[in-house]
Amino acid sequence: MDVSRVCIYLGNTHLYSPTCVLYNLFFNSNQMDTLQPISPSELIINPDGSIFHLHVKPGQLADKVILVGDPGRVPMVAAHFDTCECDVSSREFRTMTGTFRGKRISVVSTGIGCDNIDIVLNELDALANIDFATRTLRPELRRLEIVRLGTCGGLQPFTPVGTFVASEVSIGFDGLLNFYADRNRVAELPFEQAFRAHMNWHGEQCIAYPYVVHADKELLDRIAADDMVRGITVACGGFYGPQGRRLRLPLADPEANRKLEAFTYGGLHVTNFEMESSAVAGLSLMLGHKAMTCCMVIANRVAGKADAEYKNSIDKLIRLVLERI
């Protein structure tokens, strides 16, 4: 075992990595002294004691968290709650915490993209694991269960509009994890090498260095039953060019979607496009939380079909996640 990281075996076997979870919340030699207060410029706390962007206070966060992109989807999820204890909004971030069949759950909107996931995941972890009074890490670290519930574009004939897809593996085109020291500790490096070779990108073409991360196996198995298709999800840094859509601007790699459709690794196909799963899985793994993403296909790029009236049918996916989280 690599002794430079603290690794606790939690029974979570990765498909492409060592049979342990990196539960290395700030225990890495590159990371901060756990007794050293975090400065106000690094951890910004609002005057009411809430975290900077989310405006949520530590006591308002449940251990089970559902992430949605659209703030309007938060009350759609919370409508199924038996009780609701808080409803907090700030910018595109809305949080409602309540109970569903005895389970305390927070549903949080993230907005669109991995840049927003960087804000949300770091602030959720701060709420869970930093003492706001002393600005130091709590002695007992808290592990969250995080499920992103969203929409996506299908990339295979077997993922038509309406399919529920679970991201067993996510490929990040956004570059976010490349800014963190633990990037190579959580990434699936042989998978990355095989993917880069397959895409055959050179020079400045699609230059963000793709990273590959795996969902938490136990949480994936619990959420993704036989009613979901498992596969590889590509998390893009945009909706148009990065996902191969051309309106007026030409694409750097017009063949990218065809190459993605043909790529396989470890028996898995690239099933779908979205814009957040890689950051959710990667940051959660770095921070010691359990995370996975499941989405409903609302556009199939192979068939050229889309459903803009998907909001009624996504309620089935909401109920499934609430029952299984």
Residue ranges of model-derived segments:
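Alpha-helix C-terminal capping segments
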Residues: 154-159, 282-290
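Glycine-rich phosphate/pyrophosphate-binding loops
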Residues: 287-302
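Short hydrophobic targeting helices and cationic amphipathic motifs
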Residues: 10, 15-17, 25
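Metabolite-binding pocket within alpha/beta catalytic cores that recognizes anionic/polar moieties
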Residues: 33-211
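A C-terminal functional module that forms or caps the active site or interfaces directly
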Residues: 245, 251, 259-287
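Active-site rim beta-loop-alpha module in soluble metabolic enzymes
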Residues: 192-264
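His/Asp/Glu-rich mid-to-C-terminal helical/loop segments that flank catalytic regions of hydrolases
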Residues: 300-325
